[in-house]
Amino acid sequence: MACVSHWLLLLSLASATLSRPLWSERNGLIEMENSIRLGGNIILTPSEATANQKLMTVKGAEFKEAESTGLFPPSMHFFKARPLIQQSHVFSILHQMPKGGALHLHDFAILSVDWLVKNASYMADCYMCLTRDGGVRFLFAKPAPVGMLPPGCSEWILLETYRKKLGDVTEFDKGLIRNLTLLTDSPEPHIPSQDEIWRRFEGAFITASGLICYAPVFKEYFYESLRELYEDNIQYLEMRAMLPPVYELDGTVHDQFWSMAIYRDMANKFVGAHPDFLGAKIIYTVHRHEDLAQVTEAVHLAMKLMEAFPEIMAGFDLVGQEDAGHSLYQLSDALNIPSKLGVKLPYFFHAGETNWQGKDVDENVLDALLLNTTRIGHGYALLKHPVARNLSLELNVPLEICPISNQVLLLVSDLRNHPAAVLMAEGHPLVVSSDDPSIFGAQGISYDFYEMFMGIGGAKADLRTLKKLAENSIKYSALSKEGKEKLTEIWQKKWDKFIKDLAMNWKKEL
């Protein structure tokens, strides 16, 4: 950055003394701008250079087609763009690319909802009730539940019996799937405001929780989530988890320590079967609607979980709609407790997930940094706070960019206009993730990589950009030095194979 400032100073001095445009400096300035872009300073190997040439040929062809048809997926709502992305050769390449770690995903919105409906809801003793607004709630019980109805719900219906009476079970299951996602063919008129989309968004979590919080489903859901991420060529997961009570048919209710032990054991089981996957860590979260006393209690619990599960517990965060919840400053007395006690509790705060400016909610980006956050979730408002932006750079605190989430939750419509476009151009530390892919109708993080590469990064984003994003996911993870080295080793082997396949085999006619 000092080099850039030096060049700009010389240019301004020259412009002050000369009346003619300094066209002789144009190429140098463009080259300088390209060099400071995210990944711009990476020197590609010969094989990577060949692979990059093929990648950019494919990307250029898709840009040209978009200009001809007027259909450019990053400029469209994801629900409409999704089938176009699935047909994209660029997307196919990104799916095959080893992406390192997925660092921003939420516990009950990782695995495709098809699995929940086609597997969990077909398990014995699964009951359903219908809400007044057309939604559903689930409960496992034996014998049949008496009472225990959520507000505004019908009587409990045993799904096994109900399905036997249906003429079209497939259509019924499609209806259940719709209740677990936000997918719609016409997103614009059906989603009028941020408050409404957040109401539906959190409703999908509530619906899913009735299935996932049943202990047998809880275990398999996490294992299958790891499998789906693995199939998307992800080598490591950091998952935000609220650790709600998990129940058994006999009435036993498990606490947060039980859930953490299950996450640890299932992750170890998956790694045992897939040694080219490093594992998972958990970021314990509570809702930002909770009051100071409740957050204080949660912080104390987080410290206990850190002590009990040092190998899998990564830290603490607050979740939920920022505009409607408490700000970090309002909860600072609770969040300052670990530092006052001399206890290490890393923070991974959601901050600045808002369109507002000059309110408590967008000042969360500054307060997150003052609270020594390890990463910033979303950070959509960071551009409006130059001091926080510079502090983030100085402290080397990355933003977790989740493009599809930001679009679906109505922060931005055309992803070419996402604030991360500016941050990428400046070389700001960033990682890519997918937040809640199952609710958005996505899987893994390849869809978000596509939006980042094609839309936010613009035409000049290339293999260096992708490599830097993957490397950042390792560099800025919560892993120890040894863990990062091991993950780098796993990723590098896969990266080298990916480059070889792309350079030598993929679309040989290019």
Swiss-Prot record:
Which free-text remark accompanies the cofactor? Binds 1 zinc ion per subunit.
Reaction(s) catalyzed by this protein? Answer: adenosine + H2O + H(+) = inosine + NH4(+)
Leader sequence segment: 1-19
This protein's major location comes to secreted
Report the enzyme's class at the first EC level: hydrolase
Q: Which cysteines are joined by disulfide bonds?
A: C129-C153
The cofactors required by this protein are: Zn(2+)
SUPFAM superfamilies recorded for this chain? Metallo-dependent hydrolases (SSF51556)
Protein localization:
Secreted
* Note from the entry: Morpholino knockdown of the protein results in reduced body size, abnormalities of the body axis, and changes in expression of developmental marker genes.
**Its biological purpose:** Adenosine deaminase that may contribute to the degradation of extracellular adenosine, a signaling molecule that controls a variety of cellular responses. Stimulates cell proliferation.
Official protein name in the record: Adenosine deaminase 2
Which species expresses this protein natively?
Answer: Xenopus laevis (African clawed frog)
Name the gene.
ada2
